[in-house]
Amino acid sequence: MSNKYSTPVRRLHRREFLRAGTLAMGGMTLPELLKQRAIAGSQSRPTSVILFWMWGGPSQLETYDMKPDAPSEFRGPLNPIKTNVPGMEICEYFPLQSKIADKFSIVRSLHHKMSSHNDGSIEVLTGKTPPTPDPTSTRVSSHPDFGMITSYARGTHADGMPQYVGAQKSPFMTRPQYLGAAHKAYETGDPSKPEFGAKNLTLTTGLDNDRLESRSNLLSQFDVMRRRFDAQANAMDDFNRMAMNILTSPTVANAFDMSQETEETKDRYGRHRWGQSCLLARRLVEAGVAVVNIDAAAPSDTSKNFSWDDHASAFHIDYAQRERLPQVDSGLASLITDLHDRGLDEDVMVIACGEFGRTPRITYAPKNFSDQPGVGRDHW
């Protein structure tokens, strides 16, 4: 990843970034992907990707690429602060990240031509350009996203751990398609809620592992004929097999057990959806999950700022960022710091992005979703 600043860390150029697995993941054919993995050999260390997915299109001008010297119609309402990297400034609501800026890079060179949410998301997550524009943003992908491809390429963990996890939930516009239902992301639910536990990890009262195995065997006998003729059933069999592995795996149960974290650690990440999702993501990659997609669209179930789609008619970009950005800051700063402290920084790539950015020119509206004057930016 390259930026214009002179930093003490090694510069990672765009080709390397793409080769590592974001946009290029969908562009690489599956045989090529499997061949590269075979070449790497069994001695290579397992690697993971954590995607902090800010669906809606976060504004670069209110986050990591501020223009404080631009005219008022462009620069925006927020102010920059200095970081520990000379010449590099980020938003004032990122004080924690400003102290670890030498541990991440700002990428300004990636772009595409899609201007609607689902089209842009599909381009970023699958590497495939939709054939025609869909201004309604209702399109779903014809190809799997990079997490689904990774799940297929790496195969099932022997200990039942899924390869692809959606922390809170996964992108709604991508589908596993020809790879099969077993490679859809395993969605965890909101880890910040008191009742959080990975979905379906707790067996029904009175049902132990032996009885579960018996029920599974009986179901297999009933389905033996149907599976011979029904291709869809084969995909569901894979999904059911994965679900049973998850149910009975102590490794999975341990990875999802947030009670093992200290109260201080939970506070440091932030007692909110995004902070606890970052903490869960760290635990999951430590347990061997290949791809974790953190749903960072809405800060909470009750937030009026339910996505990053900061049109003037929707939100007030200043007020919305005051809610969002401190939560982004505590979650990402703690995650990046922990990965470095635990020696995982060479094995885990953390990406924070949305499907596109926002226009340089600020727009205004007499009333937004909150019946207040709106200030925002459009798709770009």
Regions flagged by a language model, labelled:
Residues M1-W380:
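Ligand-binding pockets and gating/stacking loops
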